[in-house]
Regions:
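Residue at a conserved register position within TPR or TPR-like alpha-solenoid repeats
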Residues: 34, 68, 109, 177, ...
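Structural motif corresponding to the intra-repeat A-B loop/turn of tetratricopeptide repeats
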Residues: 3-4, 37, 71, 112, ...
Length: 694
């Protein structure tokens, strides 16, 4: 093995076992070598025999758990893990192989799309059995917890939710079972408690969690709904309702299938002319990454032309949209791709991101592009399910570029007026405003508004939604809200917290939780309060928050980077003062200056100033941060490109021209908003996670 001759080692171990099969150390090697060779079937046989001969061996049980989960025998793997844990406790020692088995089960769950269960298994492993971080379990857990495609409320760290004095004994029993992966036994303990106290919402919430971690989604949803029925006033009931609607995959009744529609084009020239003259279409300027993403739709061929399909025609479509905002009609019913001369087959039109309810309208537009002919539908694929309301809110960014602030103020005002008039299927015939006055419906209104703030955490959306929250008098008691967040480590309620009312420790705790879960925009709400208190807060946490805040500034404020830059410089000075890593802050400053230099709209004076700052910054980075593991490679790359940028600026200035802005060097996904480039109306490119889907 040391000489990297695993095949020879495997043959030798097999030979020795044929002579004497009663050797636990040889079976441990055999299982390890079988897995290294990628022989799943042989490993399963070896693990089964190992566990049969040595039923109390933690290593044998760990290998058996790995074999079972690789064969999709999840319940059996969990039982083997539980027995493994119990034997480790009895022997007073935890083997590395047992932690590896626990992590393997967690990885398998994540690969199968069972994210809440994966987080539970990995959290137990990292917290209880790998506190010294001897494996990569911690990194894997954080990676999964920060996945943006999974609803935040379903990727929080595990908690029993049993905090009342009367359920302390139950909490102790449940916790002991959980630490040993005995989720079924914990579930039975809660069910026995509910036989004597069926009206306790915390017990029902705990039951929902336990079923969730066992991949029993219908049972979990049922328990969460019961909790919500019993807690119609507090934040726990809202969290329960939020989870239940996600598990039922119905959302607030506005979830629809999202289609990719492909049509054959009989007359390419006429159709292309119709596309270019249609006032409902706006040509999309795509960067290289976006074009690469589109290649998979038509083999390796990029579309000849791409358009946003707007519901309202130019030039007055924006005002029409505002007038109809309370009707919840997505602004962009689809994204149109035209494939013409560059393909060997017939010309085609592909329309992506089409909600089922918008298909008739989209097909009427296609018919018009084809000169009134009935379109020949080649493909109609359901690519995901999507919320109509969320799609409408995300579409707003397509009409606010390139100068969003002016239009957004008008949009925000109109949203505050319109949202209370919206209707949801679970609340019909009531509007949100009417339902907020009904004690039986109020939690649904809270859940719906909170869901929007979690799904679309950008300030342009959260500000008007939170204003509606206040307008409808939906606030919880501040102490009650903080208590639930504190006890459950759940960041889902963060949009409702008032940062100014949090103690220093609770403020830092919430910031850490949000950063851990990758919630930059929610975290940014707490930044002003952190800045006000930074002299008495933990500098390391402040430095971490600075990095998150600077990333948002770069994403949303790069056109104003010269005015933003002093704030970033202050962050860097703070980090230097406290001896904290700050290379990433320098890198974001570098990217902000480069964005200005590459901008089409920045004036020559602004570019000259940005270039001067860039030279100064580059010299500093090259002198002091070249060996910085965080940004060393980035420094080298941009240092090499600086000379080319300088030459281009000199040439363009001499010719009296502006330098064209190249494609943004960042990865595009449908829920990344950019003030500089509109997003594609393709929510299917990054599907929203639902239970059991990955």
């Amino acid at each position: 093995i040391a000489a990297d001759q695993s095949r020879a080692a495997r043959q030798q171990v097999t030979t020795w076992l044929e002579r004497d099969s009663n050797r636990a150390c040889l079976w441990a090697y055999k299982c390890l070598l079988d897995r290294a060779a990628g022989s799943i079937e042989e490993h399963a046989k070896s693990a089964a025999e190992f566990a049969r001969l040595f039923p109390n061996s933690p290593v044998a049980l760990a290998e058996l758990a790995i074999a079972q989960v690789l064969e999709n025998r999840f319940e059996e793997a969990t039982e083997s893990l539980a027995r493994c844990t119990e034997q480790c406790e009895a022997q007073g020692y935890f083997y590395y192989r047992t932690v590896a088995a626990m992590t393997t089960v967690g990885e398998w769950l994540a690969e199968q799309g069972h994210i809440p269960a994966a987080i539970a298994y990995l959290w137990i492993t990292s917290t209880r059995y790998d506190s010294q971080k001897q494996t990569d379990t911690h990194d894997l857990l954080r990676e999964i917890c920060s996945r943006g495609d999974v609803p935040l409320e379903l990727r929080v760290l595990p908690a029993t939710a049993l905090t009342k004095d009367k359920v302390k004994e139950l909490n102790s029993s449940v916790s002991q079972h959980i630490w040993r992966f005995r989720f079924s036994a914990a579930e039975q303990a809660v069910e026995r408690y509910l036989e004597t106290d069926p009206e306790e919402p915390q017990a029902w919430y705990c039951l929902g969690n336990l079923r969730l971690w066992q991949i029993n989604y219908p049972g979990a949803a049922e328990a969460y709904l019961r909790c919500a029925q019993l807690d119609q006033l507090g934040p726990l009931g809202v969290l329960a309702l939020l989870r239940a609607t996600k598990l039922k995959k119905s959302g607030c009744g506005d979830i629809e299938d999202l289609y990719l529609l492909r049509y054959e084009v009989p007359d390419p020239q006429r159709t292309k002319e119709a596309l270019l003259s249609d006032r409902h279409l706006s040509q999309a300027s795509l960067n290289n990454q976006q074009l690469e993403d589109l290649r998979g739709i038509h083999g390796e061929v990029a579309p000849e032309a791409q358009f946003f399909l707007f519901r309202y025609p130019k030039p007055d479509g924006f005002q029409q949209f505002l007038a109809d905002l309370e009707l919840v009609r997505p602004l962009v019913p689809g994204f149109v791709l035209y494939y013409g001369r560059q393909t060997d087959g017939p010309a085609q039109i592909v329309v992506t991101g089409v909600l089922e309810s918008d298909r008739p309208w989209v097909e009427s537009r296609v018919r018009e592009w084809l000169g009134g002919e009935e379109p020949k539908l080649v493909e109609a694929s359901v690519v995901s399910a999507y919320s109509r309301i969320i799609k409408m809110l995300r579409d707003l960014h397509l009409i606010t570029s390139p100068s969003p602030d002016g239009q957004w103020s008008e949009i925000e005002s109109r949203l505050v007026e319109s949202i209370p008039k919206w209707r949801l299927p679970p609340l019909e015939p009531l509007t949100l405003e009417e339902a907020a006055r009904d004690p039986q419906k109020k939690q649904w209104v809270r859940m719906f508004l909170l869901d929007i703030m979690l799904r679309e955490p950008e300030p342009h959306v959260t500000r008007p939604v939170y204003e509606v929250w206040k307008k409808l008098e939906l606030d919880f008691s501040s102490d009650e809200l903080v208590a639930v967040v504190d006890e459950m480590r759940d960041p889902s309620l963060a949009p409702l917290l008032d940062p100014a009312r949090l103690s220093d420790q609770k403020l830092l705790d919430m910031c850490f939780i949000l950063a851990y879960h990758g919630q930059r925009y929610l975290l940014d709400r707490f930044v002003p309060e952190v800045l006000d208190r930074r002299d008495r807060l933990n500098p390391q946490v402040v430095g971490m928050i600075y990095q998150q805040h600077a990333a948002i500034l770069l994403e949303t404020k790069w056109p104003e980077w010269l005015s933003v830059r002093p704030e970033v410089q202050d962050m860097i000075a703070y980090c230097e003062q406290h001896g904290l890593p700050h290379g990433k802050l320098h890198e974001m400053d570098l990217l902000g200056l480069l964005a200005l230099l590459n901008s089409e709209s920045a004036s020559p004076e602004v570019k000259d100033q940005a270039l001067s700052f860039l030279r100064e910054l580059s010299k500093h980075l090259f002198s002091h941060h070249l060996d910085d593991a965080e940004i060393g490679p980035t420094v080298k790359r941009y240092w090499e490109g600086l000379a080319e940028i300088t030459r281009e600026l000199k040439v363009s200035s001499a010719a009296g021209q502006d330098v064209r802005r190249p494609s943004e060097p960042k990865i595009w996904t449908p829920d990344v908003e950019s003030a500089s480039e509109p997003r594609l109306a393709q929510p299917e490119a990054k599907k929203l996670w639902v239970p059991g889907m990955d």
